[in-house]
A protein has these predicted regions:
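Bacterial N-terminal signal peptides that target proteins for export
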Residues: 1-7
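Sequence context surrounding c-type heme c attachment/ligation sites in exported
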Residues: 26-57, 63-147
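Boundary of Sec targeting at the N-terminus
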Residues: 20-23
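N-terminal signal peptide c-region/cleavage motif recognized by signal peptidases
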Residues: 14-18
Length: 147
């Protein structure tokens, strides 16, 4: 019985990763999806290291997020829209509202730059507040520009 429960739990934990994997994506779409996965991992690392007050990891992760913010626009050329075969979650609004998308990226870029600066002061409350701004910029963009 224990083995059966373990297998079921393992299946339900890993199944979402298979269903949303980028194995069908190629080229710029695959690269974009990998960059977003890396960004997600960096956000998790920052969140974890806030509780440990590990400002070096927080700053390094914020620097990587800021680098991604500055190059993100290059990963959304025309023709890289979402389709049923590439598993991209990019909304058509990215291409129909390019100014809005640029503004959302700029918000992320500014928030991540602020996090770099604030985390260097090693004040946990200010750093946590700045991290929430970065997270809000991600959420805001995803709500508007992700399917």
């Amino acid at each position: 019985m224990y083995k059966c429960k373990f297998v079921l739990i393992l299946f339900f934990i890993t199944f979402p990763f298979f269903s949303y994997s980028n194995e069908n994506a190629t080229g710029i779409i695959k690269e974009r999806m990998e960059k977003f996965q890396e960004s997600k991992n960096l956000m998790r690392a920052i969140n974890k290291n806030l509780s440990d007050s590990n400002f070096n990891v927080i700053t390094q992760s914020a620097e990587k997020l800021n680098k991604w913010a500055n190059e993100m626009h290059k990963f959304f050329p025309k023709g890289s829209e979402a389709s049923s075969t590439n598993k991209s979650q990019a909304s058509d609004d990215i291409w129909s509202n390019p100014e809005g998308f640029k503004k959302a990226i700029k918000t992320f870029e500014k928030a991540s730059a602020k996090l770099i600066k604030i985390s260097k002061n090693k004040n946990i409350n200010d750093t946590a507040s700045s991290f929430r701004e970065v997270a809000a910029s991600c959420k805001g963009c995803h709500q508007k520009f992700r399917n």
